[in-house]
Amino acid sequence: MAKKLAITLTRSVIGRPEDQRITVKTLGLRKMHQTVVHNDNPAIRGMINKVAHLVTVKEIEE
């Protein structure tokens, strides 16, 4: 099956630049320690790289 990514917001977006806030919101994260699951594709990987210091990522098989 396709790989999926479990993305968890581990640091706050308070005081972060607007583009990083928008990226976190686009990933579907609203609250601290919230986890969302996305398909593993280049677009999602690019967003993760942009806010890598705010999130943790786990690869999961489904």
Curated annotation (Swiss-Prot):
Pfam families: Ribosomal_L30. Keywords: Ribonucleoprotein, Ribosomal protein. GO terms for cellular component: cytosolic large ribosomal subunit. Gene3D superfamilies: Ribosomal protein L30, ferredoxin-like fold domain (3.30.1390.20). Coiled coil: none annotated. It comes from the Bacteria. GO terms for biological process: translation. InterPro entries: Ribo_uL30_ferredoxin-like_sf (IPR036919), Ribosomal_uL30_bac-type (IPR005996), Ribosomal_uL30_CS (IPR018038), Ribosomal_uL30_ferredoxin-like (IPR016082). Part of the 50S ribosomal subunit. Belongs to the universal ribosomal protein uL30 family. HAMAP family: Ribosomal_uL30_B. This is Large ribosomal subunit protein uL30. The gene is rpmD.
